[in-house]
Amino acid sequence: TVPSDSDFKVIYGVEAYLVDDLKGMVTDSQNQDLDADYVVFDLETTGFSPETNRIIEIGAVKVQNGKIVDKFSTFVNPQVPIPFRIEQLTSINDSMVIDAPVIADILPEFMKFCEGCVMVAHNADFDMSFIKKNCQRLDIPCKPTIVDTVALARVLLPNLNRFKLDTVAKALGVSLENHHRAVDDAGCTAEIFVKFIEMLRDRGMSTLDEVNAMGTSSVQNVQKMPTYHAIILATCDQGRTNLYKLISLAHIKYYHRRPRIPKSEFIRYRDGLLIGSACEAGELY
């Protein structure tokens, strides 16, 4: 028991597993028709961070009316050695990129290839983070509409537990050869996306805004989405009550392998709470 005259203060809080269920399947939608032109692309890189790692391969296919009509494929000279683990994963080595164009020369060509098209990728946040960072460095405008086939798969293929490209391809009967090579992964993703378009039409949808309106925050989807560490602290009695509610929801309603707090629920019970990004497993990292 803390003495009443003590200056010791108890602060209620928790290190939580936060799920971003507010992010749509389509980013920066202009309410394009499902019959829009698409560029489905994939990157291979030297690592996971666009701040410190480099693009080593760009592969893309252009889709019009459900058919692949054009391709874009190139190695990119990263001007640094390719790490051994990346060489093992992609089979791309230094000798294959030594004579390739550098990103400053090839990225303008790629963005021109994408002009007027919706951009599509599997786990689009990763690939677009590299595209946007390099566009920023090179002062190239970059504000496309982006569709994430991972987010679509969570909604359209609810029976799957994992949504890696090879898993989704197998579920839909799509061939995937030379996995972790950009143009092959892009072609596979394009075939998957064309099938998803038909599934969306079967649900009566005709625009990308309607796709986003489906939402991603069902209990089943939250249970399959990635989690980020977060620190949540209560600043008052109301906050402590809301903290208890969130912890109860995380353990009773959304639990799957770990207790999960969706951002939508956090916003609902936001009063009296402070949130931080926690450790290296937090969203900011």
What name fits each language-model region?
Residues 54-56:
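Short coil-to-beta strand junction motifs in C2/discoidin
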Residues 70-72:
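A structural microfeature
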Residues 74-89:
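Short, surface-exposed acidic-centric catalytic microdomains
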Residues 47, 58-59:
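Early-domain small/polar-rich strand-loop-helix modules and first-structured segments
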Residues 43-51:
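Short acidic, Gly/Ser-rich segments with clustered Asp/Glu that frequently serve as metal-coordination loops
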Residues 1-44, 61-62, 67-68, 79, ...:
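Phosphodiester-processing cores and adjacent nucleic acid-binding clamps
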Residues 103:
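Conserved catalytic alpha/beta cores of large enzymes that bind or transform nucleotide phosphates
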